[in-house]
């Protein structure tokens, strides 16, 4: 086993993988359904398992993300199928959604929740799992992505609604709470991104026009129709887009705040649909604002 893992690690290193030993072990642990690294070193592989292991290693060597090789991720207690038709849920999103869940648990009067551009369904399904009093609707423009989200809802026994369509088009009434992770990479950022992103994750879910800001202009134009008066929304944004997004919404008379993550990078934009200029902080634990 030591020899196999050493060869696997050396192969991944030669392919530019940043943490080759850890990833060689992770891929093998997933294949053998072993949760302990110490148990891994005691395992024995059949010739068929070795062949399958090297097949997965070669995929990783081609810079296919590990999550796509495994075919699943865990997100706040929800097991999600992930394929190249959907984005891989990010850790910073998981940390943030924990706080959104806390907000909904504190504000029981907020009973309708939209997860727009839902992809795998990670946000909406996690909200439904932890906030059963909330009616959750997930939407996406991609039929393939929506099919995966629906499959994830079934496998986790979570009752939610699904709508197929572009941004806010499929919704017929406004929500109390909205979360949207629109495409926000510029062309330049996309072509400079890691091969794991550029060559494997879905272009349509990543790129928001030449500047990366196309969808925020559209959202700002129609946000009053999608949120009830007093409704709140959080939009995921690029790490340097905070000021630009704030100006887009302010130009439409919508006040909001940029929330930063633990690394002090722009991460979310909080907004509230109300007639006056006062906006509640939108701050959640671990995310500062400006």
UniProtKB/Swiss-Prot annotation:
CDD domains: AdoMet_MTases (cd02440). The keyword Ribosomal protein does not apply. SUPFAM superfamilies: S-adenosyl-L-methionine-dependent methyltransferases. It catalyses: L-glutaminyl-[peptide chain release factor] + S-adenosyl-L-methionine = N(5)-methyl-L-glutaminyl-[peptide chain release factor] + S-adenosyl-L-homocysteine + H(+). S-adenosyl-L-methionine binds at residues 140, 181. It holds the Pfam family MTS. Its EC number is 2.1.1.297. Belongs to the protein N5-glutamine methyltransferase family. PrmC subfamily. Methylates the class 1 translation termination release factors RF1/PrfA and RF2/PrfB on the glutamine residue of the universally conserved GGQ motif. This is Release factor glutamine methyltransferase.
């Amino acid at each position: 086993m030591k020899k196999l893992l050493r060869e696997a690690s050396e192969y991944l290193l030669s392919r530019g993988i940043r943490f080759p030993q850890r990833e060689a072990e992770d891929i093998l642990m997933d294949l053998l359904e072993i949760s302990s690294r110490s148990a891994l070193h005691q395992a024995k592989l059949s010739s068929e398992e070795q062949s399958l292991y090297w097949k997965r290693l070669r995929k990783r060597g081609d810079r296919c993300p590990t999550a796509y090789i495994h075919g699943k991720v865990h997100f706040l207690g929800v097991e999600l199928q992930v394929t190249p038709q959907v984005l891989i849920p990010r850790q910073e999103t998981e940390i943030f959604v924990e706080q959104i869940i806390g907000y909904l648990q504190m504000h029981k009067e907020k009973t309708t929740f939209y997860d727009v551009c839902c992809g795998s369904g990670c946000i909406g399904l996690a909200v439904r799992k932890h906030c059963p009093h909330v009616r959750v609707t997930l939407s996406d423009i991609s039929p393939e992505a929506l099919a995966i989200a629906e499959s994830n809802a079934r496998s986790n026994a979570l009752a939610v609604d699904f709508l197929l369509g572009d941004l806010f088009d499929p919704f017929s009434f406004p929500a109390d709470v909205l979360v949207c992770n629109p495409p926000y990479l510029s062309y330049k950022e996309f072509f400079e991104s890691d091969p794991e992103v550029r060559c494997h994750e879905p272009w349509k879910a990543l790129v928001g026009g030449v500047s990366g800001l196309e969808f925020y202009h559209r959202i700002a134009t129609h946000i009053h129709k999608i949120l009830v008066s007093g409704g709140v929304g959080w939009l995921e944004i690029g790490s340097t887009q905070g000021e630009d997004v704030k100006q887009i919404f302010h130009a439409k008379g919508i006040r909001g705040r940029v929330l930063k993550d633990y690394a002090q990078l722009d991460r979310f934009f909080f907004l509230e649909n109300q007639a006056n200029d006062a906006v509640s902080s939108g701050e959640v634990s671990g995310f500062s604002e400006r």
